[in-house]
């Protein structure tokens, strides 16, 4: 079950039924999985926000779906000046209530929560509060993952270097949706494409004698 806002829904994407990240995730995972898209445009995580996810039809459908795996990406709309400045103190408890509700629906479900996708600096409210509130919500999400015992995945870092993938400063284009799907796929399967090293590490690289060298890369979990 993919739970979220318009980014999960696939808002602004041509043919969202094919190009939204949950649809792309379905193709990556194959027929052994059934992926449901329960994104609601404009939804907030905050239950006192302007459009609380837990009060939407999509939430109830996600609960009825009772998925074995639940992927949650919520918080972008909570940067609205109607929401975070007034109700920030409820964010962690509301997020934990959402997590707990999926555990009630399926006691064996595995839950992944995502760090927020970037908001580009051309967003009209970027410097008037959105940037700082976005950072505060990111930190809250990281703490929730730690204390609620759920898996944290990162929707921010893979998109951050590519602001052109956010044409309206918020919603990923088709290429960006592909990156989100790949991030979820890696988080679910532990398949990161095998051992991959930075292109800096080549057969002819020069090493400094007698100095420790930290070599970094990615590998399957």
Put a short name on every predicted segment.
Residues 7-96, 132-135:
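Conserved SGNH/GDSL esterase-like catalytic core that processes O-acyl groups on lipids
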Residues 73-79, 99-135:
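Active-site segments of SGNH/GDSL-like serine hydrolases
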